[in-house]
Every structure is written in C-alpha cells, then in structure tokens.
Amino acid sequence: MRAIKFAQVVVLILDAQEKFEKQDLTIARRVISEGRALLIAVNKWDLVKNPKEILGDFHNRLAKSLPQARGVPIITLSAKTGSNTKKLLPAVLNIYELWNKRISTGTLNRWLDIKTTNHPPPLHGGRRIKLRYITQAKNRPPTFVVFSNLSNELPISYSRYLVNSLREDF
C-alpha cells in the first residue's frame, strides 16, 4: 500500500477467473483516494469462455462497488500466451497523459456553461445556486475548483454530476 503514494500510475492486475475480491476493491479505492491514475488489467483472458459477458460483468461490478472509479480503463490480456500484452504500456502512457493534462480556464468555463444550461444547479432556500466559473487548481491528480454564490449548499449529487461529466468530456 505504501508504494501507491510513490506511484503515478497504478496497474491493478486481476484474475479473469476470479470475482472482485474485497482486497482488490480496497486497493482500487486507495489508489483513487491517493489521487493516482488507475488502470485495471484482467489477466488469464485466454481462459475466458464468454469474453463480452465477462468484461461487461467486470465493468458492472466496478461501477456498483466503486462508483468513483467510473471511466477507469480495463484492458484484457494473457501473460501466458502474450495476447494483448503489447497494449499494456500504451494504455499506461495514455492514462498518464490524461492524469497529467492541463485544461485552460476558458475551455472549462465554456464547458461549465453548457453543463449548467443543460442541467441547472438546484435551488437552495428559494435561491438559484450560480456556478460562476471553474478552474484547474492543479494536475497530478487533476483538481478543479468551482466558484459559486452558495458553494457550501451545492448538493453532493450535483457535484458528482460535474465530476462524472468532466471525466466523460476530458
């Protein structure tokens, strides 16, 4: 677990024939809470009978058990046969690039305007919560700050909507 603090990208290798263990989820949760980039590699893929079904199952279990890991890439490989092993390094480099990405304030503000127009923040005490602007405070991990008139009153569900939208769009 200490190695996670020193890592920039963590590759969590899972066995395709095993269910998500509690320990796997604990490690993934720790990686995310430490602000590290996470990539999930599912090994022994050559032994899987129904690949599409099993991969869908991995995505569903990850989404259910660890909603903050939404959008984490999952690659399948077989160390024994060498299948898809050449995709591992490019996937690591790609996720590192995303983790290291800087987005301009202007781009973020245009994005915020679109998101708040399509799905406005809720009212609080009869007053509309106005999201004034957004900026990227730091990268590694990408950290964003939204300024508003009632920032303490913004519901967690709306914050999650913004976070998930950021992940999808950038």
Model-derived regions: residue spans:
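C-terminal-of-GTPase-core extension/linker across diverse P-loop GTPases
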Residues: 1-12, 17-170
